[in-house]
Amino acid sequence: MTGKVTISEVSPRDGIQSITGDFVPTEVKIALIQALYDAGLRRMEIGSFVSPKAIPQMADTAAVLAFTKTLPGLESTVLVPNRRGFDAAIAGGAERLGFFMSATAGHNKANLNRTREESFAELASLVRDTPKGTLIRFNLSCVFHCPFDGVVEDAEALDWVERIVALNPDMEIALADTTGNASPDQVRRVFEKAHAAWGHRFAFHGHDTYGMGVANVAAAYEAGCRVIDSAAGGIGGCPVAPGASPS
């Protein structure tokens, strides 16, 4: 295990989606991505192919994706929640797809209006249908705590991880502290268990809601995690986890 860490910058997606009020112009999003690229970042979540009624700020993701394809060496990930988003992402030439669901029933229902089994069944079909050469990252929200269901037991979260792992031997899996409630001990323990069972294929997506973001990143690193999400300026958060701010 090397000490090298891959930073995945999520502010163009996680940050922008949280902005209410006026629509952030496409050129502003492009300028943000260009600035991050100029700063040396080479991996970013740049948008989501979701319903513009649900998340209006992501309505121009196709245009943003087209711009990112002009930046040499940039790994651009777009999030897709369902078949419609998947089809739009593939049509737009996406080379990295981010699938997502929640480890808890309450958050999955609030965020996706589906049961976990319904989400998993559709995402499993999307994993199977992903074109060869297209990379996948599977994001599991609320691994540690849920705004609706409270503290998540390790076993519940890891049961879902086990099912996700079985879908594809190569895809990266992100374990998310969606609300920022996790403790370093909890993060370290879950990552140690995941790595012991399925190898070092996991990323950490944390939030700094209660000032524990950096400590939790350190705990994930100590447990062997080498892919960490960041958000420039600490902007962003989940629409159904009020107050959560990225680390």
Regions found by a protein language model. Give the residues of each.
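Hydrophobic faces of well-ordered beta-strands that scaffold small-molecule active sites
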Residues: 6-12, 16, 42-46, 75-80, ...
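Alpha-helix-loop-beta-strand connector modules within alpha/beta enzyme cores
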Residues: 54-78, 118-136, 158-164, 186-204, ...
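Conserved N-terminal beta1-alpha1 strand-loop-helix module at the mouth
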Residues: 1-45, 57-63, 67-71
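Glycine-rich, proline-tolerant flexible connector loops at the mouths of alpha/beta enzymes
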Residues: 42-67, 101-114, 142-149, 174-184, ...
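Catalytic alpha/beta core domains of metabolic enzymes, predominantly
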Residues: 176-247
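N-terminal small/glycine-rich loop or linker at the start of catalytic domains
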Residues: 1-21, 98-111, 134-148, 190-199
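Active-site mouth loops of central-metabolism enzymes
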Residues: 8-30, 74-83, 108-115, 143-156, ...
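Conserved anion-binding
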Residues: 104-162, 166-178
